[in-house]
Amino acid sequence: MANVHDRLQKLAIILGGVLLTLLAMTADAVRQDLDAQWQSYADTQVTLEPAFTFPHATCFKAAALQYQLPETLLLAVARGESDFEPTARSRANAHGVMQILWPGTARHLGIHRLSDLYDPCTNIDAGARYLKELLNTYSGNMHLALAAYNYGPGRISKDGHNIPSGATWYSDYIFRHLNYVLGNGKGGKPIPDTLYSAIGQSTLLTFGEPYRAAAFIARLEKKAPSVSLDWFRRGTGEFEVVMTYAGRQEFDTSAGQLRNAGFRID
């Protein structure tokens, strides 16, 4: 019996090692895919104009010019962080449009009054300055800079190895919002000068974990591929899946398609 027990222990150790290796290989593959996506954006799309007229547009344009950053990148971060809400506050004590952490990151950026973070232009400038600093730290690698924006530079290695899964998720999450900002979503590019505030959002479900929100969207998109779906990390730490629509007609059409897919909007 002792020999059997020893053999099982050795087998468990071997299988555990194989599993860890496979997980590491998967993580590396995901990182490489994200690196490639962000590099493609850096090579071909950074000069493109936003597809919508977004809130605080003059603040974003000024910050992009000041720090030589793509305006669409700043907009993607802001949409993912707060959906452009100046008074947004997270349970991690991050504040404003770009969700600047108080007091640590804010003071690092020279902001010493919490109330200043609720001024959109001040907050957007701070977020842009921090992102530029991180891009310089990571030699222009957008994936790593965004991972550090979310997790802090102390937890993201410059060689990109052993990045926390949550930081990788965040980079992918912002890339999804970038596609929306560029007009690459299901609905295609909107009419020029369309106000972002004119696009409606109807909440479908809220999840406690990001992978559940992503899986729910993936299932719905297979059943109702023409419906515009998106998801946001809210200040509560929850993840909200929404249907987006431009006008009543699109709402009714999309709601009907979701009903046919087995999901009813009240």
Question: Whereabouts are the PLM-identified features?
Answer:
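Export/targeting segments at the very N-terminus of extracytoplasmic proteins
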Residues: T26-F84, G185
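N-terminal Sec-pathway targeting helices
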Residues: A2-G17
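Catalytic and substrate-binding regions of cell-wall glycan-acting enzymes that process beta-1,4-linked
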Residues: Q39, G140, L144-G188
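Substrate-binding/active-site groove segments that recognize
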Residues: R91-I111, A126-K132, A147, P153, ...
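Secretory-pathway/luminal and periplasmic proteins that interact with or process carbohydrate-rich
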Residues: S82-R89, L134, P153-D159
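Short, functionally critical alpha-helical segments immediately adjacent to catalytic or ligand/cofactor-binding
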Residues: L69-P86, I100, I124-A128, A145-G152, ...
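A short, structured beta-strand-centered segment in the mid-to-C-terminal lobe
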Residues: H112-N123
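Extracytoplasmic
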Residues: E209-D266
